[in-house]
Swiss-Prot record:
Gene Ontology MF annotations: GTP binding; GTPase activity; magnesium ion binding
Documented EC number(s): 3.6.5.-
Group of enzyme by EC: hydrolase
Species for this entry: Rhodopseudomonas palustris (strain TIE-1)
Signal peptide (UniProt feature, chain positions): none
InterPro entries: G_OBG (IPR031167), GTP-bd (IPR006073), GTP-bd_Obg/CgtA (IPR014100), GTP1-OBG_CS (IPR006074), GTP1_OBG_dom (IPR006169), GTP1_OBG_dom_sf (IPR036726), OBG_GTPase (IPR045086), P-loop_NTPase (IPR027417)
Top-level taxon: Bacteria
Matches recorded under CDD domains: Obg
Protein name from the UniProt record: GTPase Obg
Entry GO CC: cytoplasm
């Protein structure tokens, strides 16, 4: 299934039905009086967070959603039927923004959560509603009220316990495929991973969700490489596993490049719990490995873990370290532009794939 993390959608709730002008007509009843029914209420547009979804791809093929109009009132005091609601299913982690892409309307954080995005118009009153002691035979009724319409943006930020970050070709996809059943594309060239990948990892009987975030390069927050379109997914990760390629020119500089991009995008990202690991240790000589480890230790101000995603060396230790810190991390880090502070929401270029 293709991955899509942002979509623009048009919605319109149903118009209310019109009220009816009618009078009772029966044999031997000279003054039957008004009996026009009220119009039905228009259908709502409802958004629901559904289990089993991890992409907004459905909204590439259908961008317009219009709820049903309420039925018109009829004689004999018959009221119009209510219009059918439309329920739009989205993955957990989806945010709804106004057309300006900055005003946050709602943020879905749990399965089954529902939000009424547009309410249907109320039905109009029939002439029976207007009967009074001074107006025994009203000959007017109300039209139904129109529904609400607007353009909105759906933006998905994947929710994972841990996120893999690093430069392109740091071995993130190889690591994910080694520790989970996920099958990301793996090749010896930059930007092999074009979309975030999720995998469920089991370590010593403890399960957690690991996300492989496409590689970042210098200037990513300004649109370089794959840009900052995936940095938003990191906001929802409780812990970061930062992988550095031991075969790169300078492990310390590689570490600082990624940290700089995270900080430039949002200062909250650098405050997350981070585990630093030097990958591909099987591909370098012992002397070079020691140099790279020392460089990385000075840059990160912590001793990095050593591992090889290909041979599996050091992988169990990294997983145990992740399990240990995931338990300490906040259950849900506050994302930029959440409902408490929508003004901080940052514009984000759509993922078009």
């Amino acid at each position: 299934m293709k991955f899509l993390d942002e979509a623009k959608v048009y919605i319109r709730s149903g118009d209310g039905g019109n009220g009816c002008v009618a009078f009772r007509r029966e044999k031997f009843i000279e003054f039957g009086g008004p009996n026009g029914g009220n119009g039905g209420r228009g259908g709502d547009i409802i958004v629901e967070a559904a289990d089993g979804l991890n992409t907004l791809i459905d909204y590439r093929y259908q961008q317009h959603f219009k709820a049903q109009k309420g039925g018109n009132g009829m004689g004999s005091d018959r009221h119009g039927a209510g219009g059918k609601d439309i329920v739009m299913k989205v993955p957990v982690g989806t945010q709804i923004f106004d057309e300006d892409k900055e005003t946050l309307i709602h943020d879905f954080t749990k399965v089954g959560e529902r939000f009424v995005l547009a309410k249907g118009g109320n039905g109009g009153f029939g002439n029976a509603h207007f009967k009074s002691s001074t107006n025994r035979a009203p000959r007017h009724a109300n039209p139904g009220l129109p529904g609400e319409e607007r353009w909105i943006w759906l933006r998905l930020k994947l929710i994972a316990d841990a996120g893999l970050v690093g430069l392109p070709n740091a071995g993130k996809s190889t690591f994910l495929s080694k520790v989970s059943a996920a099958k990301p594309k793996i090749a010896d060239y930059p930007f092999t991973t074009l979309h975030p990948q999720l995998g469920v990892v089991n370590s010593d009987g403890r399960e957690f969700v690991l996300a492989d975030i496409p590689g970042l390069i210098e200037g990513a927050h300004e649109g370089a490489g794959l840009g900052d379109r995936f940095l938003g997914h990191i906001e929802r990760c409780r812990v970061l596993l930062h992988l550095i390629d031991a075969t790169c020119e300078h492990a310390g500089k590689a570490y600082k490049t990624v940290r700089g991009e995270l900080e430039a995008y949002a200062e909250t990202l650098v405050d997350k719990i981070e585990i630093v690991a030097l990958n591909k240790i099987d591909a370098v000589e012992p002397d070079e490995l020691k140099k790279q480890k020392d460089r990385l230790k000075r840059a990160a101000k912590k001793t990095p873990l050593l591992l090889s995603g290909v041979t599996g060396q050091g992988v169990p230790e990294v997983l145990r370290a992740l399990v240990a810190v995931i338990g300490e991390a906040p259950v849900s880090d506050k994302a930029i532009g959440t409902a408490d502070n929508p003004a901080e929401a940052k514009p984000w270029a759509p993922q078009d794939a």
